[in-house]
Regions:
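Rossmann-like adenosine-cofactor binding region
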Residues: 21-103
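Conserved acidic E/D residue at the C-terminus of a beta-strand in Rossmann-like folds
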Residues: 8-11, 31
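Adenosine-phosphate binding glycine-rich loop
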Residues: 81, 86-178
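Short, small-residue-biased leader/transition segments that mark boundaries at the very start
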Residues: 1-7
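Short alpha-helix immediately C-terminal to the canonical SAM-binding loop
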Residues: 16
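Residue-level "edge-of-site" marker
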Residues: 11-12, 54, 113
């Protein structure tokens, strides 16, 4: 049997169109809504929850009722566990004891999943962050912020103030613009 993969369309439609183009008919994208989520989750052998709202807790999109409706022996992997998890039945586990059962569905909710492959994850993180660090080193922080909107967007604190709104809201702290 060939695997059937579904991705849910979120705010970034351009990115999902790109994925449609490069994967052809191997991946289906659908609009993210409760009905489509229920249809796909309850018919899946493997559900991978990957939800990120930068600086905030992940929304609980996979309810316990959906987990209950999954086939016995199916699996739920919650990649969002470091942000609180996107499943109501999710709880952090470790690489040493990675799985548990809820309603006969295997759950894998390991915190810091990249920690299982430290060399590879360090290499990947370095590849995506080195350019920003070099820009800051070459131009200084103020000029880097002005020159590169991505640098500005990635700053959480600046001159002693919390500048990332979602983090400030999550901790009930005051937010300041750069």
């Amino acid at each position: 049997l060939f695997p059937y993969t579904t991705l849910f369309r979120s705010i970034n439609h351009a990115r999902l169109r790109y994925l449609d183009d490069i994967t052809g008919s191997r991946v289906t994208t659908v609009m993210s809504n409760a009905a489509n989520l229920a249809e796909e989750v309850t018919n899946a052998d493997l559900v991978i929850g990957s939800v990120l709202i930068p600086g905030a807790l992940a929304p609980k999109l996979v309810s316990e009722d959906l987990i209950r409706q999954m086939r016995p022996g199916s699996a739920f992997v919650d990649i969002a566990i470091d942000q609180g998890g996107c499943g109501e039945t999710s709880r952090p586990t470790t690489h040493h004891d990675p799985t548990y059962l809820v309603h006969d569905v295997v759950h894998y909710c390991v915190s810091n999943m990249p920690g299982a492959v430290p060399r590879t994850s360090t290499y990947a993180l370095t590849n995506v962050t080195l350019g920003y660090g070099l820009t800051i080193a070459q131009k200084g922080i103020d000029a880097a912020i002005e020159a590169d909107p991505a640098v500005k967007k990635g700053i959480n604190t600046y001159r002693g103030k919390l500048t990332y709104k979602a983090v400030a809201e999550a901790f009930g702290m005051e937010h300041s613009e750069i």
